Design a protein with these regions (language model features):
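Helix-loop boundary and gating motifs at the non-cytosolic
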Residues: 1-58
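Hydrophobic core of transmembrane alpha-helices in multi-pass small-molecule transporters
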Residues: 19, 88, 100-117
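Transmembrane alpha-helix termini and helix-breaking/packing motifs in multi-pass membrane transporters
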Residues: 30-39, 95, 152-173
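Helix-to-loop junctions at the C-terminal end of transmembrane segments
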Residues: 59-73, 161
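Cytoplasmic membrane-interface "Motif A"-like loop-to-helix N-cap segments
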Residues: 70-83
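C-terminal ends and interior cores of transmembrane alpha-helices
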Residues: 83-98
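Cytoplasmic helix-loop-helix junction between adjacent transmembrane helices
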Residues: 107-148
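Helix-loop junctions on the cytosolic side of multi-pass membrane transporters
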Residues: 128-129, 175-190
Length: 190
């Protein structure tokens, strides 16, 4: 049985949000890598942006997990953190070519601190959506969103960058993360 809804709307909404956020996340790193190189002509810029975003995400996990566990409304915290992550990605995009690399790395580090909302923060909400035997099925489907995003995100980044430019690829990644916000906000209904 699905949580409080017998038709599975909660799980479908959860999975749609997870897929969008994770595709945007998996797209953001390669898009920033491509942007750094496209704008500066130096491969080190792109790889530095990717490294900064990634390292901060790993460091931010325990911090975000503790906040989420203590939150009275984890759905709202998750939604706000998704918005902050998307805005951080956009800020990096806007600063590339305008600021020196140390400043770019600092912005990417700050943005990356919000990355755990897309991964563990989202998955931690699954028991709010499904319970009992459906939790196993929901967990398997949730895991599939990681796999699908890890395949689609980089390909989408390359396709958008080749078609419209690297800046557009970064903005598309941020838009995908933002598309997940309504799903995150709706988690309190289940």
């Amino acid at each position: 049985m699905f949580s409080r809804y017998t038709d599975g709307r909660g799980l479908r909404r959860y999975l749609a949000g997870a897929a969008a956020a994770r595709a945007g996340d998996e797209m953001s790193g390669p898009a920033l890598l491509l942007l750094g190189f496209a704008v500066t002509g130096r491969p080190g810029t792109g790889s530095g942006l990717l490294a900064s975003l990634t390292v901060a995400g790993a460091a931010g996990g325990p911090w975000f997990g503790a906040l989420l566990d203590r939150s009275r409304r984890p759905d709202r915290l998750l939604a706000r953190t998704l918005v902050a992550y998307a805005l951080g990605i956009v800020a990096v995009q806007a600063a590339v070519g305008r600021l020196p690399m140390p400043a770019l790395a600092a912005i990417a580090l700050l943005a990356g601190l919000f990355n755990p909302a897309v991964t563990g923060g989202w998955t931690a909400q699954l028991p709010r959506v499904v319970t009992g035997r459906e939790l196993d099925r929901g967990s398997a489907l949730d895991a599939l969103t990681f796999s699908a995003a890890s395949l689609a995100g980089p390909a989408l980044a390359a396709g958008v960058a080749a078609g419209v430019g690297a800046r557009a690829a970064v903005l598309t990644a941020a838009a995908l993360v933002t598309l997940a916000v309504p799903s995150a906000c709706s988690l309190s209904r289940y």
